[in-house]
């Protein structure tokens, strides 16, 4: 969620990709090309003039200028590569849905195991997804309330370090509070902390309301389709098929997080800034889709192995939070992708 927050603050107000893209090289691009041409030096040898061409590698300063100079043609290509990457991930997900959903796999999935589940396992999974639906509803209400409060909306839209720091503190504090309260021993405070956490997340999502209701409604439908399809894949796949992806997903999360941080300090119209933006946006969409597969099977596994009368009880709110954060990350990226896509068509 931290990466999603950073990307949203950096990219939405600035509207990185303008509706029209230049097709001719700008003066800055021409100057860069001129500086990097062959260096021609005359020399005299035995009364005969010859031209000697020497190769000159780019200096560190020139590499920095090339990475930071504006080039809308390159930015457009980088954006297209990111969208093709997402399209490839969608094709793989659709293939997995057909493969596992049609029962082509020889291994037993969670949906087959559900027939022999005890009733308490079914109740645990049902309550987990009910809390997920409640969190999404509370987040939407909170975002709407913040959007209709000018003072709060202005604070969330500034993008200053004070806003970012306060947002981080609120998210981390609310998350720690929810996890620290016992679901069995203190149900009242637990539910209050859960609602507080959903409200904080709604404030984080509130800046997206500037994109308009129709676009956000489309993003919500697309997100519902993505989450529903991936949840079906996780249910139909072998019960531990995606639980071995923890280490690669951690590496990918670090890459997306670093790209999100880097995009804050680089001009969005530069090649380097656009590259980091694409990694954080499009790579993040694929990454959190894979996280959703992992977390869904993790929730099912926890519901199965947690003993009914053990010392450690099953907590549906804590179990739901990972899927909720994945869903929120996917929604924010889908909404931003739709916004940049509609900008280009104008």
Swiss-Prot record:
This is Growth hormone-inducible transmembrane protein. Belongs to the BI1 family. It catalyses: Ca(2+)(in) + 2 H(+)(out) = Ca(2+)(out) + 2 H(+)(in); K(+)(in) + H(+)(out) = K(+)(out) + H(+)(in). Residues 105-126, 182-191, 236-245, 294-346 are mitochondrial intermembrane. The gene is Ghitm. GO terms for cellular component: endoplasmic reticulum membrane; mitochondrial inner membrane; mitochondrion. It comes from Mus musculus. Its main location: mitochondrion. Undergoes AFG3L2-mediated proteolytic degradation, upon hyperpolarization of mitochondria. GO terms for molecular function: calcium:proton antiporter activity. Interacts with LETM1 and AFG3L2. Induction: By growth hormone. It is found in: Mitochondrion inner membrane. Plays an important role in maintenance of mitochondrial morphology and in mediating either calcium or potassium/proton antiport. Mediates proton-dependent calcium efflux from mitochondrion. Also functions as an electroneutral mitochondrial proton/potassium exchanger. Required for the mitochondrial tubular network and cristae organization. Involved in apoptotic release of cytochrome c. Inhibits AFG3L2 proteolytic activity, stimulating respiration and stabilizing respiratory enzymes in actively respiring mitochondria. It comes from the Eukaryota.
